Amino acid sequence: MASGAGGVGGGGGGKIRTRRCHQGPIKPYQQGRQQHQGILSRVTESVKNIVPGWLQRYFNKNEDVCSCSTDTSEVPRWPENKEDHLVYADEESSNITDGRITPEPAVSNTEEPSTTSTASNYPDVLTRPSLHRSHLNFSMLESPALHCQPSTSSAFPIGSSGFSLVKEIKDSTSQHDDDNISTTSGFSSRASDKDITVSKNTSLPPLWSPEAERSHSLSQHTATSSKKPAFNLSAFGTLSPSLGNSSILKTSQLGDSPFYPGKTTYGGAAAAVRQSKLRNTPYQAPVRRQMKAKQLSAQSYGVTSSTARRILQSLEKMSSPLADAKRIPSIVSSPLNSPLDRSGIDITDFQAKREKVDSQYPPVQRLMTPKPVSIATNRSVYFKPSLTPSGEFRKTNQRIDNKCSTGYEKNMTPGQNREQRESGFSYPNFSLPAANGLSSGVGGGGGKMRRERTRFVASKPLEEEEMEVPVLPKISLPITSSSLPTFNFSSPEITTSSPSPINSSQALTNKVQMTSPSSTGSPMFKFSSPIVKSTEANVLPPSSIGFTFSVPVAKTAELSGSSSTLEPIISSSAHHVTTVNSTNCKKTPPEDCEGPFRPAEILKEGSVLDILKSPGFASPKIDSVAAQPTATSPVVYTRPAISSFSSSGIGFGESLKAGSSWQCDTCLLQNKVTDNKCIACQAAKLSPRDTAKQTGIETPNKSGKTTLSASGTGFGDKFKPVIGTWDCDTCLVQNKPEAIKCVACETPKPGTCVKRALTLTVVSESAETMTASSSSCTVTTGTLGFGDKFKRPIGSWECSVCCVSNNAEDNKCVSCMSEKPGSSVPASSSSTVPVSLPSGGSLGLEKFKKPEGSWDCELCLVQNKADSTKCLACESAKPGTKSGFKGFDTSSSSSNSAASSSFKFGVSSSSSGPSQTLTSTGNFKFGDQGGFKIGVSSDSGSINPMSEGFKFSKPIGDFKFGVSSESKPEEVKKDSKNDNFKFGLSSGLSNPVSLTPFQFGVSNLGQEEKKEELPKSSSAGFSFGTGVINSTPAPANTIVTSENKSSFNLGTIETKSASVAPFTCKTSEAKKEEMPATKGGFSFGNVEPASLPSASVFVLGRTEEKQQEPVTSTSLVFGKKADNEEPKCQPVFSFGNSEQTKDENSSKSTFSFSMTKPSEKESEQPAKATFAFGAQTSTTADQGAAKPVFSFLNNSSSSSSTPATSAGGGIFGSSTSSSNPPVATFVFGQSSNPVSSSAFGNTAESSTSQSLLFSQDSKLATTSSTGTAVTPFVFGPGASSNNTTTSGFGFGATTTSSSAGSSFVFGTGPSAPSASPAFGANQTPTFGQSQGASQPNPPGFGSISSSTALFPTGSQPAPPTFGTVSSSSQPPVFGQQPSQSAFGSGTTPNSSSAFQFGSSTTNFNFTNNSPSGVFTFGANSSTPAASAQPSGSGGFPFNQSPAAFTVGSNGKNVFSSSGTSFSGRKIKTAVRRRK
C-alpha cells in the first residue's frame, strides 16, 4: 500500500517501490500478509485513525470475513512468502494488487478485494500516496496496506495502486497530490484524503464502490501511513505529482505501485489477482462507508476547500525538517530496509506489533489520532495498528506466519525463529517496526520477506558452519616435527653421513609407523604426531640444542651430551650411532607416537621455526652428536619420520640439503659437496664442525664429527650465525669468527684481551669447538641460545652512574669513566681506564674521558680543568672553593657579596653590606637570585639583601606568574629573596601602592618604611616587570649603602642599598644614603629608585613607586637604574655596571646600558650618564648635572627644578623629566605615576610628557619640570619635563617640556610644544613616538605626531611619521591611523588605530581598548582623564593602560594579578601621587 500510496501520490516512486516490494517482498510480504489480513484491518486501522471504532469493528468484521478470505490467502501467502519471500510477497502483492488494483483497476475492485487494505490503502495511497510512498512499508504494514506493502511498492501500491490507479487516477489524481501531501503531513494527508474521500465519495457515492472505499481506505491509509513511517514519495515530491503518479497509475491500473504503473508491485499479475480477492465489494463498501466517515472528518477538514487542502498538501509535501525526518526514517527503514532488513525484523515485528498495536489501540483513538498526529502517529505506531486492527487478520497472519515460520523454523531454525517472531511474534515486533515500520513499512512487503530470507540464510550458514566443524579432519594438535619434517627444509645433512641413512630411514619409518601406524602410509601428508616424533627423535637428538621442540632449553643444555635429554625424541639419534639411531628411532618414535605430547612439548617450546631448526629438520646435525655417518642417517630417518615420504630417510628439505649439497651460511645457497666455496658469495665451505657450531647445536661440540657436518641442518640453522661469529657488544654488529675487532666500531672481540664471559668463550671455544670439546660446546651454548645473545658477557658490569654495560676488563665505565664498582681504582684512575680500554680499543672513548681533576660547573655544566677555580663559561666558583662564585641559585647575601657581578645574567647579587659593591663579581651568574626576575618586584625590606636572581632552584617567591604577593614590610624584608622570577607576581607591601603597569613579574607595593627595606630586600635580578613601590621617602631609595647588584635584573627593581645590579635588567636598586654608588652594570631592567627622583629605570615589568617623590624618574634603564639622590654617579659606558659613589656626585655611569643612577645629593654635581643606555639619571639636586650620556632608555629626571640639570645625553630610551615629577624611564612594564615619561607600554597620564617607557604608564604628579632636561636620544621615553627638555636623540623618548629641544629622540615626541623636535623628538614624532604634547610636531620617523607616541602608550596626535599615527586629525602616516596611540599604547582620543596590538582600537589592537593606537600591543590609552596619555608620548608602550598585556601600562601589570585594564593607569597615577 505504501507503494500504492506512493504510486498514487508519487507515481514513479510508488512503482519503484512496488518493484522493491517485488524484490524484497519476502518480509514485506509478511507485512503485506498482515496488510492482506488487515486489508480490512488495514482499512479499519486506517479507519481507526479516521473512522470511529464501530466502523472499525464493522470493518474488522468485514475484514474478518473478507480478510479471512483475502487475508487467508494473503496471510498464508505471507507465511509462504516468509518461506519464499519473493514469491509470497509477489502473491500477496498480486493479491493486493489484484484485489486492489488489478481486479479492480477501477478503484472499487482493487480496494474491495484489498478490503480495508486495498481500499483504504489504495485510496490512502491515492490521497496519501506520499504517505504510503514514504510509508510504502508502513502502508504495507498497515493491515491492508501492509499486505500491499509487503511487497513494499507492490502490495501497498497494488492495493492503493489498483484502487487508486483507477479511482485515484481518475478522481484522486489531483486529490492524490493532496493525499500525498497529506500523507506527508500525515494529518493533512488524512484531511486531503477526507477531502478526496469526500470528493471521491461524493463523486463516488457508492458506499462500497472502489472509489468510495478507496477514498476511505486512502484516508485511512493516509492516516495509517501517516502514523507509520513509510517512504512517502510525496514527501520527496515524487508523490506530489500525484497526477503523474495517477497518470502512471492510470496508464496501468495494475501498476498501482507508486513506482511503476501496474500491480507489478508484488507479484505482477498475482498481485492483481490478490487485489481482486482483497477487493471484495463487501470490504470495499465498509471501507467506503468508513471513508465516508473519514470524509466527514475530512469534510470537517473539508471545511477547507479542496484547493486549500491541496495547497496544504503541497506545503506538506514540501520538505520540512520535521516532515522529512518523519519520512526519511520510513524511507531509510522502509525502502532501504524493506527488501532486506525488514524482511526478517521489521516485517515480522511490524506485523506482530501492528496486530498488537491494532488491538492495543482502540479504533476510536485511530479516529482521534488521524487528524493531527496521523502522519507521525500512523507512521510510527498507529499506522501499523490501523493495518493490523482486524484481530482476525492479525490472527490469520500470525497463524500463517507462525505456520510458515514454524515450517521455516523447522527447516531453518534461526530463520524460523526469527520469522516466527517476525510473523507470529513479529506482530508485536511489527509494532516496534511500526516506528521502524516506517522503514519496514516501505520495505515492509519486500524488505521483510527479504529479511526472512536473509535470516534463513543466516540460519543456514550457522548450520553449515556447524557442519564444517565436524568435517574438519582430526589432526593431533601437537603437530610434531615428524609431520612437518615431511617438508622439513632444514635436514640438509641427512645424507651427510650416508652410512646408516637407510637404517635411520627404516628406524624412522618404523618409528613413524609405530607412532601412527597409518602415518607410515601417509605420514608425509599427515602431520600426524608419529612423523613428527620420528623426525624429532632423529632430528632433535642431533641438534638437540635449539631444535628440540619438547624442551629446547634443556636440549640446549644437553648440547654436548644432552642427547640423552633429548632422548625421548632426539636421544635415540643423539645417543646412538646410526645403528643405535635406527633402533632408538624405532623405540623413540613409539615414544613419540605415544607422546605426540612429546612433540607437543617441542611445539610448545618453540614455533615452526623451532621445528625447522629442530634436529628433526636438521637431523643430520643432531646426529652429528653421534659423529658417525649414522648421525646423518638420523637425519635420514628424520625424513622417514615423514617416512612415507622419504623411505630413503631424506625429507623434502633433506633432498635439497642432502650430503650431495651444502648450504652456504652466508647466502643460504645450496652448493655441491664438491664446491669448497659458495658459488654465489664465495664464502668458504664450513667444515661440518663449523657448520654445527654455526648451527649453534651443542651436539656438534659433542662430536666434533659429522655432526658438525650438518651445514645444511635445520631450516632455522640457515639463519643462525656461523659458528664462531660474534656480536660486537658495542654496536651489536655480527662479526666473523676470525675478526678480532668489530668491523664496524673496531671494538675488540670479546674475550680477546679480556676474560670476556661466555661470548668470547663461545667464540674462541667455537673455534676450539672444532675440536668438538663438549665443554667448548657448553660455552658455545651461550652463543647459541637466542637469549644468550642478549646475556651479558661473563664479568661484564653495569655502570652505576650511566647504566652502560662495560666489559669485564674495563675498570671504568667506557661512557662516563666511572670506576668499576668493585675496583679500588680511584676516580683518577681515568688514566687506568684508557689502559684497560686500549686492549679493547675502547673505541677511543678515552678521548672523551674527563681529565683527572676536571670538574663540571654546577651552573652551566661546562667541564673545567682541575686547575680552574672558576668556571670558564660562567666563572662560577669551583665547587668546594670559597670563591665569590655564586651558585646558580645562590645569591651572595653578604654585604661584601654586594659587589658588582659582571653581567650576571639572571643573578642579582644584593648585599646588605654597602661597602663592597663590586667585591663579588658574579660573572654572568645565571641562577643568581637577583637575576632575571621578569615580573617580580621585590618588596622585601632591607633585611634581606638577597637579590632575587633568576633563581631556578630557589623556591622563594618562585616565578609566581600571576600572583601579586602583598607582604608587610617586616615580612617583605624577610621575603626579599622570595621573589624569584615571578612573572606576574606583584608583591604588595602593606602600604597601598599604585599598581605597577605590566610589571612583567611583580609590582612591589610597599609602605614608606618598607620602601627603604624594599630597596634593600628586593634586588630582583632581572625582575622583568617588577616595580618597587616605596611609600617611604627618598631614604628608602637613598639606602645606597647596601650595594645591591642585581645581575641583569630585567624587571626587578632593587631596593636594596648600594646593590649594584650589573645588567640587572630591570631591578631598581634603592641604595641607602650611605652608599650612593650603586653599580647598575647594565642593569637591564633594574630600576633603582632614588627616594625623591625615584627613577624607575626601564624596570621591564616593574614599577617602582615612591609616594614621597613624585619626581621619580623612570629612565628606561635597560637593566638597572640606580636612583641615588646624589647625582655623582656617572655611568661611563659601564655597560652593565653603574657605580654611584656617595661621595662623588660625579659617579660616571659609563654607558650604563639601562642603568639610571639618580644621585640624591643636590650639592653634588649631576651624575653624568655617559650613554647610560637605559639608565635614567634622576638627580634630586638642582645641579641635576647628572647627564646620562646616551642613557639608552634612561629617563633622567632631576628632582630639582634646574631645567638643564639633567642632560639626558643620548639617553637611549629615557625621557628626561626635569623638576620633581619623576621621569619614568622606560620601565618596561612599569608605569611611573609621578612622571609622565611613558614607559614602553605606558601612557603618561599626567600632562608631563612621558619618556617612551616601553610599557610604563607614567602618571606624572607634577607636570611641570622646571629644569630643562636634555634628553639626548632617549630611545623610547619622551622627556616629560615641561621645561625645555633637550632630548638628545631620545630614541623613543618624548620630550614633554615645551622648551625641551629633543635632539633626535628616535621614537620620542617632545611633549613640550616649545621643544624643537629633535631627530625623533616629539615635534616631529620620532620613530615610534608620538608627541605627548598637544602641540603638533612634524611627525618623526616612526613617531606619531602630537601626543601619539608610536611606541609609547597613547599620546596625543603628532604629525604622523612613517609608521606613526597622528592622534589628531593629521593624515595617517604610512601604517598609522591618525589618532593612533604610540606603538603599544592606545590613545583614547583617536578612534583609528594602525595595528595596535593591545589597543582597543580596531587596528589589530590585541588588548588595547583605545580605538586608536598604532600597533599598541596592550596599551590602552583610553582613559580621557589622563592628560598624560595624550600629552605624554610613550614611545612603543606595549600596554599602556589597558590591562591587556600592558607590559608596563597602568601600574597594572597585565600579567601581574594586580594590573587592571584601563582604570589601572589612573589608579597607579593616583597611587604614585599618593606616594
Swiss-Prot record:
Covalent cross-link Glycyl lysine isopeptide (Lys-Gly) (interchain with G-Cter in SUMO2), where: 353
Comp. bias regions, Basic residues: 1465-1475
GO cellular component terms listed in the entry, alphabetical order: cytosol; host cell; membrane; nuclear envelope; nuclear inclusion body; nuclear membrane; nuclear periphery; nuclear pore
Gene Ontology MF term list: DNA binding; identical protein binding; molecular condensate scaffold activity; nuclear localization sequence binding; protein-membrane adaptor activity; structural constituent of nuclear pore; zinc ion binding
A GO BP entry: nucleocytoplasmic transport
Biased segments, Low complexity type: 1147-1157
Location of region: 29 X 2 AA repeats of F-G: 236-1418
Documented effect of changing residue 1415 to A: Reduces binding to HIV-1 capsid protein p24 (CA)
Cofactor: Zn(2+)
Keyword terms, alphabetized: Acetylation, DNA-binding, Glycoprotein, Host-virus interaction, Isopeptide bond, Membrane, Metal-binding, mRNA transport, Nuclear pore complex, Nucleus, Phosphoprotein, Protein transport, Repeat, Translocation, Transport, Ubl conjugation, Viral penetration into host nucleus, Virus entry into host cell, Zinc, Zinc-finger
The keyword rRNA processing appears for this protein: no
Region (Disordered): 1-37, 90-124, 171-225, 1128-1167, 1311-1402, 1420-1475
Residues bearing the modification Phosphothreonine: 102, 369, 388, 588
Record InterPro entries: Nucleoporin, Nup153_N, Retro-transposon_transp_CS, Znf_RanBP2, Znf_RanBP2_sf
Start and end residues, zinc fingers (RanBP2-type): 657-687, 722-751, 793-822, 851-880
Family statement: Belongs to the NUP153 family.
Subunit structure: Part of the nuclear pore complex (NPC). Interacts with TPR (via coiled coil region); the interaction is direct and provides a link between the core structure and the TPR-containing nuclear basket of the nuclear pore complex (NPC). Interacts with HIKESHI. Interacts with SENP2. Interacts with XPO5. Interacts with RAN; the interaction occurs in a GTP- and GDP-independent manner. Interacts with MCM3AP isoform GANP; this interaction is required for GANP localization at the nuclear pore complex. Interacts with MAPK1. (Microbial infection) Interacts (via C-terminus) with HIV-1 capsid protein p24 (CA) (via N-terminus).
Protein name according to UniProt: Nuclear pore complex protein Nup153
Organism for this UniProt entry: Homo sapiens
Gene name, Swiss-Prot/TrEMBL: NUP153
